[in-house]
Amino acid sequence: FPTRRSSDLMLTIKGTRGDRMVLGIPNNNVRKQYYDYLKEMFEEKSPIDTSKLDDCFYDMAYEGKWQEGLTFLAESYAKVSSVRDGIEGERNIQGFFMAYLNLCNYYITAPELELNHGFCDFFLLPNLAHYAVKHSYIIELKVLPKKDFSALCEDRKTTKAEAQWNEAVAQIHRYAEAPRVKALRQDTLLHKIVMQFEGWKLKNIEEVE
């Protein structure tokens, strides 16, 4: 298939998601190389305070305080995107989040993990072999172009943003109910987080009960 960037050459086809291909990184060495490449690319545009990020990761892992860290990542993404010709899209956001979540030693970050016949964007699996982590996370990212965010759906009753949010809530509930989740999260408390973007700006972030 055609590639848009040189980094695409480092990906391989892992499966399908409807009529789309699910791309994955073939092995751990290539994975590290790929996400190091992404991180360097983003750092050239707008460096991130990784010391602050480390503190946020600690709070997520041990205190269950996730909002500051994920909001910080979203705001950092907005700074990068605002100087990158207005590039928008879920794939771009996923790449950014993966590059920086991959810095967190408290978790094994699993992107596009199949759960209940769907694929969650990120599952932060507790790295209990090395850290006494108390909390784990499923994170679902949703993106709408600016022109569509406030537009009405065909029923003329709800906006496209509202419909997308409701879909994300239903999806993340379904992922969390997958039989394998209990084994994956082990004895940690699972948090289900939905993040919704209007273009490159975070508009909504919430823990789904």
Predicted segments, located by residue:
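Generic, low-specificity signal for short hydrophobic/alpha-helical stretches with a mild N-terminal bias
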Residues: 16, 20, 39, 51, ...
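Generic alpha-helical structural element
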Residues: 23, 58, 62, 85-86, ...
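Structural signature of nuclease core domains in nucleic-acid processing machines
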Residues: 66-209
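Glycine-centered, phosphate/nucleic-acid-interacting loop/turn motifs that mediate DNA/RNA or nucleotide
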Residues: 9
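Short, small-residue-biased leader/transition segments that mark boundaries at the very start
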Residues: 1-6
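Long, non-coiled-coil amphipathic alpha-helical linker/lever segments
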Residues: 34-70
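Accessory beta->alpha helical hairpin/"wing" motif in late/C-terminal subdomains of nucleic-acid enzymes
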Residues: 12-45
